[in-house]
Amino acid sequence: MSKIKRILKITFIVIFAVLMLLLTVYINHQIRLNAEAGLRLPLGQMVEVDGHNMSVYVEGTGEATLVFMSGGGTCSPILDFKSLYSLLSDKYQIAVVEKFGYGFSDVVDRDRDLDSILKDTRTALAAAGLNAPYVLCPHSMSGLEALYWAQKYPDEVSAIIGLDMAVPEYYDTMNINIPLMRAAGWAAHIGITRLIPGISDSDAIQYGTLSENEKEIYRAVFFSRTATVTMMNEMGRVMENAEKVDSMGVPQLPMLLFL
């Protein structure tokens, strides 16, 4: 056998082995997803927004409604914020809106400019029976949506409580590697993420007050809502969204920022 033929044979064997490994990982992932379906039952109410379902969780009563807004890529906003809002729901009405592609909401492949994101959030809150004005509690990237909300609809926002929220200037020097993020999305879709020990054990699981059952729910949601196409579209627009917010100036309302 010639040297070239040996190289081609070895290359074919390696490629075939990799493909079989990926197929095995994918099949295992699908089996696990089916087994975890019972854990992915919505914790809040599902409301229709533009023909798709969005998840809205409401807890507590009070004159003020605190709307918790998750950071980019947070797989389960309802559980991620639970350790905090459970301390406040005896005095305030709590609302957690899970954007498309997050938590129990549908994954949709659509543009994620600020106007679209904000329209979805406002529609979901209204469909859940919650009325403005709101106190917005954004984390990380949702800071852009909160600021834009206050700029565009000032009568709907009474205050902003930033939970380490992002501001437009944060993205001035940020280098977002979209191809790498899409590769991560592909790995999550195939199920490669299941091979990484402890990858689903977020701060909410390690340091929060979630019950053991809630931790299992979080992990199940993680493996179905990591680097979704909706999240990828959102990250692809974040620079433009930051520029839009920056061009409109600082909204004039009470703000308390925790860093």
Regions found by a protein language model. Name each.
Residues S2-L66, D90-Y92:
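Alpha/beta-hydrolase fold catalytic core
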Residues H52-F104:
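Conserved HGGG/HGGXW glycine-rich cap/lid loop of the alpha/beta-hydrolase fold
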Residues V96-C137:
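Active-site loop/oxyanion-hole signature of alpha/beta-hydrolase fold enzymes
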Residues Y134-V135, S158-I161:
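Residue in the alpha/beta-hydrolase core beta-strand immediately N-terminal to the catalytic nucleophile
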Residues P138-S142, A146:
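Gly/Ala-rich beta-loop-alpha elbow adjacent to hydrolase catalytic centers
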Residues Y148-K152:
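Active-site signature of alpha/beta-hydrolase-fold catalytic machinery across serine-
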Residues I161-I190:
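Flexible "cap/lid" loop of the alpha/beta hydrolase fold
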Residues L210-L259:
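Conserved serine/cysteine hydrolase catalytic core
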